[in-house]
Curated annotation (Swiss-Prot):
Record-given protein name: Chaperone protein DnaJ
GO CC, alphabetical: cytoplasm
Encoding gene (name): dnaJ
NCBIfam families: DnaJ_bact (TIGR02349), PRK10767.1 (NF008035)
Binding site for Zn(2+) 2: C163, C166, C185, C188
Assembly: Homodimer.
Length: 374
């Protein structure tokens, strides 16, 4: 199978500068690197092809030979006098490539201290606690520094030894094709030290499990999903690393009367048939106690009344929301004979007078028009 032109492989003009070659190769190396395309044979082949093209074109003598004789000028198998692979300097490019792959450059750095993990604790509150604020005590499972070994993991009186695999660096160099990469040492897991005489309390881990009791001050106005950060109350770091944080996540339980939407509260208020028709006054609950609500005559189911300032004051500031009361008119049940007679008299007196039921009459008129059009 014939090889593609090296300039075509890199996607550059034949007169491309060294900087253009480097930029083009770096782009292809990032795109087709095996670590980004595991198990993809096509990407692996393109990665090797780009390596070969850059190895030739980045070397002035090889590039001149390729420009004059093509592949025959650089490939010994085709009768040319090329020197083969190994002459190109990939280190400056691969430093940038691996910085993007692994979040750092080629430098290893000594392993050891690592920050402890953050913890998450879900705190259940009722609506009143969330609205008014409260202080609660919580018990959280965590990892703390082992006291007998002071977090070192080694038995008291002993010291960890230098890892023979990585020489105390915490990383090992792995060869991949034309270049090498640094990876975490599989023996010491990046610590650079091997514990030969582990602490009996933590078994060499340097940390032990423990329950921690904390007092959490919950500000007024919190809602489900809000988080309270307790700095330094997460898991202990390893080998002297900083402690993580604890995030207390609020979950407000459902209330039997109120529903919350942001800073507003909602509730349903049942009223009698007669109060809806004649009007009246009734007491409705709020988080601050009962208040009187005036019901005008002719109130229908679904009518909503707003009690300003009876909602929730947001935790981030601003005025309190409102309480919105939705009326639900109850149809009377279990009527006595006399009550039925009175309602029948009322029905008879209202029959034929559309002014008492404008919505119902409008609906029936619409039904008549609908069937009349069929």
């Amino acid at each position: 199978m014939s090889k593609r032109d090296y300039y075509e492989v890199l996607g550059v003009e034949r007169g491309a500068s060294e900087a253009d070659l480097k930029k083009a190769y770096r782009r292809l190396a990032m795109k087709y690197h095996p670590d980004r395309n595991p198990g993809d044979k096509e990407s692996e082949d393109k990665f090797k092809e780009a390596n070969e093209a850059y190895e030739v074109l980045s070397d002035a003598s090889k590039r001149a030979a390729f420009d004059q004789y093509g592949h025959a000028g650089v490939d010994p198998s085709m009768g040319g006098g090329g020197a083969g692979f190994g002459g190109a300097n990939f280190s400056d490019i691969f430093g940038d490539v691996f910085s993007d792959f692994f979040g750092g450059g080629r430098g290893g750095g000594r392993g050891g201290a690592a920050r402890g993990s953050d913890l998450r604790y879900t705190l259940e509150l009722n609506l009143e606690e969330a609205v008014r604020g409260t202080t609660v005590s919580i018990r959280v499972p965590t990892l703390v520094n082992c006291q007998p070994c002071d977090g070192s993991g080694a038995k008291k009186g002993s010291t960890p030894s230098t890892c023979p695999t990585c020489g105390g660096i915490g990383q090992v160099r792995m060869q991949q094709g034309f270049f090498s990469v640094q990876q975490t040492c599989p023996r010491c897991h990046g610590q650079g030290k091997i514990i030969t005489d582990p602490c009996g309390s933590c078994h060499g881990e340097g940390r032990v499990e423990e329950y921690k009791t904390l007092s959490v001050k919950v500000p007024a106005g919190v809602d489900t999903g809000d988080r309270i950060r307790l700095s330094g109350e997460g898991e202990a770091g390893t080998h002297g690393g900083p402690t993580g944080d604890l995030y207390v996540v609020i979950n407000v339980r459902e209330h039997e009367i109120f529903q919350r939407d942001g800073k507003h509260l909602y509730c349903e208020v049942p009223i009698s048939y007669t109060d809806a028709a004649l009007g009246g006054e009734l007491e409705v609950p709020t988080l601050d106690g009962r208040v009187k609500l005036k019901i005008p005559e002719g109130t229908q189911t679904g009518k909503q009344f707003r009690l300003r300032g009876k909602g929730v004051a947001p935790v981030r500031g601003g005025g309190a929301g409102d309480l919105l009361c939705r009326v639900a008119v109850e149809t009377p049940v279990n009527l006595s004979r006399r009550q039925r007679e009175l309602l029948e008299e009322l029905r008879d007196s209202l029959e034929g007078d559309s002014s008492h039921s404008p919505k119902a009459n409008g609906w029936f008129d619409g039904v008549k028009r609908f069937f009349g059009d069929l």
